[in-house]
């Protein structure tokens, strides 16, 4: 009987090992002080996860919070990369740059390693969870992960409600006393609507080392308040640091929960046409709960289907005018939209520009619109129409840009001025569109009799309104 049991366990071990086709190590620094251990699956699904072990920014717990995850992840077809980052010793840029470099290598090597470059997640534990949340919220678009897995994460850098030594080791002896740095790197404060990737948070309720409520729960709350996709699993017991350890009472349930979350994540097709929705609160989804799933860009994704990949880059209150009170082109969302490298762009700006404090700079509206267009598509730097001549047929350009006129302002909420929109802003948009050979989607005319499709403020579309917007814009895109 013992012999049968021995051989059964041996076969299971061999089967698990067989799920990993290749294992090797890459130096992230010339001296090898930072390394990335690579586990490539035998049957790749295209998904990849970059692992970030914990250890309070003083050591690396890179077994049960690192390499031991390789068998289970490779069995799911997930490529796994453990970053053994350098410790900060007060210089937070050191571990940040190591993890960013790891993600960049994974994306740059995606074709070679059979990975979808936009299905690369990050998985961090404890202090490594904090580092993962920093990358997810504060890093540039090209190294920001597509999804985030946080195990019992340190989130707050306020040592009074967090893990004291993680705060000191990350920010430094002087830095952890600086309120501005504490606020910046307490990553619940850095969550951005639409831009921070979907997350799953896994903790035990009896964690005595990193308080769940002021850390993992705080990150979940920030994500939910922003309308971003986020799940949280809190198990009754387990304390801190269980990782992939089989001693964790809820180990099997945890793997099932995590596996289901990963399996339900939708990945864009590799050749999908990228659609960037640029705009103000109407694009952002003001007044639409969970706008990332129910705003007009999300509905546009549903209507266009899997051959398109739609992303929401809307930011509430923003102006096209660079001298406006909140210029769109100063935003992270604008930089992300450019880095997204879209095939199609839908621009829906102008409503906030009509406010008196902004429209005093109306002489610059055309120039700023031209700046936005030529930044998106440098080919447009030479307009398709010379002054005084008929517009000629525009040459094909990438991205294809659609200019949307603002929907009517049925009320003057926030000093938004319908007369300025109708008689000054829209004519400039139409003039520029003609000069550059762009298509105008005239939402202003199409919504003229649709006061029932806006919220009580008379400005923002309600659920019916965002569906109508998505229908109109999808029809325009599909005609091409």
Protein language model features and the residues they cover:
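C-terminal catalytic histidine-bearing segment of alpha/beta-hydrolase fold enzymes
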Residues: 37, 92, 217-268, 456-459, ...
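Short beta-strand element of the alpha/beta-hydrolase
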Residues: 46-54
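Catalytic nucleophile-loop/oxyanion-hole region of alpha/beta-hydrolase
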Residues: 61-63, 68, 81-117, 245-253
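Primarily recognizes the serine-hydrolase "nucleophile elbow" in alpha/beta-hydrolase
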Residues: 101-166, 182, 187
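Conserved SGNH/GDSL esterase-like catalytic core that processes O-acyl groups on lipids
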Residues: 162-164, 272-276, 282-370
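Alpha-helical cap/lid subdomain in secreted, periplasmic
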Residues: 182-183, 302, 328-480
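Short beta-strand/loop motif that positions the catalytic acidic residue
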Residues: 200-207
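Conserved alpha/beta-hydrolase "acid-adjacent" motif
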Residues: 208-215
């Amino acid at each position: 009987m013992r012999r049968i049991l021995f051989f059964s366990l041996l076969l299971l071990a061999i089967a698990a090992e067989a799920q990993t086709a290749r294992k090797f190590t890459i130096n992230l620094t010339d001296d090898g002080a930072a390394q990335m251990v690579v586990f490539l699956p035998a049957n790749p699904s295209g998904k990849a996860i970059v692992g970030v072990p914990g250890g309070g920014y003083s050591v690396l717990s890179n077994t049960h919070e690192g390499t031991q995850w390789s068998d289970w992840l490779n069995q799911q077809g997930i490529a796994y990369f453990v970053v053994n980052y350098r410790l900060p010793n007060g210089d937070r840029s050191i571990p940040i740059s190591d993890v960013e470099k790891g993600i960049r290598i994974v994306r740059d090597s995606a074709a070679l390693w059979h990975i979808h470059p936009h299905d690369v997640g990050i998985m961090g534990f404890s202090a490594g969870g904090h580092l993962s949340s920093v990358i997810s919220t504060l890093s540039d678009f090209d190294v920001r992960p597509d999804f985030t897995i946080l195990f019992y994460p340190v989130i707050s850098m306020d040592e009074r409600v967090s893990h004291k030594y993680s705060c000191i080791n990350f920010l430094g002896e002087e830095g952890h006393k600086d309120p501005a740095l504490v606020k910046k790197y307490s990553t619940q404060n850095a969550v951005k609507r639409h831009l921070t990737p979907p997350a799953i948070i896994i903790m035990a309720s009896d964690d005595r080392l990193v308080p769940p409520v002021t850390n993992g729960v705080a990150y979940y709350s920030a994500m939910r308040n922003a309308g971003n996709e986020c799940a949280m699993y809190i198990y009754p017991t387990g304390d801190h640091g269980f990782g992939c350890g089989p001693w964790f009472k809820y180990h099997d349930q945890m793997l099932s929960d995590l596996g289901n979350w990963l399996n339900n994540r939708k990945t864009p097709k590799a050749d999908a046409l990228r659609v960037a929705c640029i705009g103000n609160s109407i694009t952002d989804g003001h007044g639409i709960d969970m706008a990332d799933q129910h705003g007009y860009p999300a509905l546009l994704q549903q209507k266009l289907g899997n051959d398109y990949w739609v992303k929401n880059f809307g930011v509430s209150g923003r102006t096209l005018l660079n001298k406006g009170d909140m210029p769109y082109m100063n935003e992270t969302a604008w930089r992300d939209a450019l880095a997204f490298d879209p095939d199609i762009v839908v621009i829906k700006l102008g409503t906030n520009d009509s406010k008196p404090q902004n429209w005093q700079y109306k002489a610059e509206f055309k120039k700023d619109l031209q700046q936005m267009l030529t930044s998106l598509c440098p080919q447009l730097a030479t307009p398709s129409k010379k002054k005084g001549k008929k517009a000629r047929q525009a040459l094909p350009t990438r991205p294809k840009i659609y200019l949307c006129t603002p929907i009517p302002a049925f009320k003057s909420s926030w000093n938004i001025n319908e007369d300025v929109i109708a008689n000054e802003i829209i004519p400039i948009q139409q003039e520029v569109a003609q000069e550059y050979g762009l298509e105008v989607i005239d939402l202003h005319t199409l919504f003229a009799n649709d006061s029932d499709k806006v919220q009580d403020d008379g400005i923002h579309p309600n659920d019916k309104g965002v569906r109508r917007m998505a229908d109109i814009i999808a029809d325009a895109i599909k005609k091409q």
